[in-house]
């Protein structure tokens, strides 16, 4: 794996955090005890900085969302696949997240979150957070009633998303919003509306991922009327972005509801974006689209046009054969 440019130092710091979390004690929880759900949330509440919350192999049938507000805690499962540590929210009451993290220096690894009513795993204001070897999935496939986001860090600095799998999100599978110093790598996003989305964020590297069978593969947006604006310095490289052919199933009114089926990479109103060394193929609308924000808004400081966009050295396969926008049939 090659490190590229100014993100190498950030990535090195995050790698140290991922490999060597400070250890005070290990709190082991099991899915087989009668009060398994309560014990799991209790462990997240009572953990001290440096602790590891160790999830045993098994399935938790959860009706309420979980939360973590303690800094420097590792939540580690026994695997994200079958036979691993599965947090199943099929019976969840309400529409909240599966897991909400609001503390710094948290390391999440080796477990799965299924069928949440709201977002899968969300972190807010959580700096130096690592999402590693996680699976977030809506197992019935694409549905408008699925949760909006799978992996969802927002308002954070130093974010590493590494080797995750997300399927079925009704907005974005992997979404990073209003954040800075971001790495998304070695992950798979499939059958979401947007596979990977970087929104209103600074200094992001998105590389060595697979975005396939989404409505749109990788999106880089900057939107008006948000606290953090002027998204810039985003690099999309060495990804496979192919066959993004899933019909758009976002709820009406969502910004991604306007993404045409068959979009590979879409840049909207961002600045300083590089798209290079990717494999782009079988995206019916276009492999790459660079567009302005065309909706009415009242934000006087907002810049709706993209600037300083570089597209180079990509491997292009078949594309543009079924553009899913008004007038597309006439130009295909």
Where are these regions (language model features)?
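Right-handed parallel beta-helix/beta-spiral solenoid domain characteristic of secreted/periplasmic
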Residues: 28-38, 52-54, 72-118, 140
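Extracellular beta-strand/beta-solenoid scaffold signature
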Residues: 40-41, 63, 88-99, 115-122, ...
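Short, T/G/N/S-enriched strand-turn elements that build extracellular solenoid repeat scaffolds
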Residues: 38-46, 61-70, 122-125, 230, ...
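Right-handed parallel beta-helix
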Residues: 50, 76-78, 104-115, 127-140, ...
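N-terminal signal peptide c-region/cleavage motif recognized by signal peptidases
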Residues: 19-21
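Bacterial N-terminal signal peptides that target proteins for export
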Residues: 1-10
């Amino acid at each position: 794996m090659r490190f590229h440019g100014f993100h190498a130092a950030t990535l090195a710091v995050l790698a140290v955090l991922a490999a060597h979390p400070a250890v005070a004690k290990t709190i082991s929880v099991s899915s087989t005890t009668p009060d398994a759900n309560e014990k799991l949330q209790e462990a997240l509440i009572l953990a001290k900085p440096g602790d590891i919350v160790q999830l045993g192999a098994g399935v938790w049938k959860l009706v309420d969302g979980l939360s973590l507000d303690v800094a420097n805690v590792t939540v580690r499962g026994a695997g994200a696949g079958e036979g691993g540590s599965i947090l199943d929210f099929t019976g969840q009451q309400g529409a909240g997240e599966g897991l909400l993290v609001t503390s710094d220096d948290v390391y999440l690894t080796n477990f799965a979150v299924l069928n949440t009513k709201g977002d899968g795993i969300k972190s807010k204001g959580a700096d130096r957070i690592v999402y590693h070897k996680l699976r977030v999935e809506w197992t019935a496939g694409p549905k408008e009633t699925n949760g909006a986001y799978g992996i969802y860090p927002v308002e954070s600095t130093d974010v590493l998303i590494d080797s995750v799998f997300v399927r079925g999100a009704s907005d974005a599978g992997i979404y990073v919003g209003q954040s800075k110093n971001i790495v998304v790598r070695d992950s798979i996003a499939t059958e979401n509306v947007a596979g990977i989305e970087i929104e209103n964020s600074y200094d992001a590297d998105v590389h060595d991922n697979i975005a396939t069978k989404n409505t749109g593969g990788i999106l880089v947006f900057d939107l008006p009327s948000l606290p953090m604006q002027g998204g810039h310095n985003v690099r999309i490289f060495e990804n496979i972005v192919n066959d993004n052919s899933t019909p758009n199933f976002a709820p009406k009114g969502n910004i991604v509801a306007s993404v045409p089926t068959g979009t590979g990479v879409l840049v909207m109103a961002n600045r300083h974006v590089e798209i290079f060394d990717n494999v782009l193929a079988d995206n019916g609308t276009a492999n790459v689209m660079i567009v302005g924000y065309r909706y009415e808004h009242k934000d006087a400081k907002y810049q709706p046009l993209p600037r300083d966009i570089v597209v180079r050295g990509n491997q292009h396969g078949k594309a543009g054969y079924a553009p899913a926008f008004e007038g597309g049939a006439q130009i295909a």
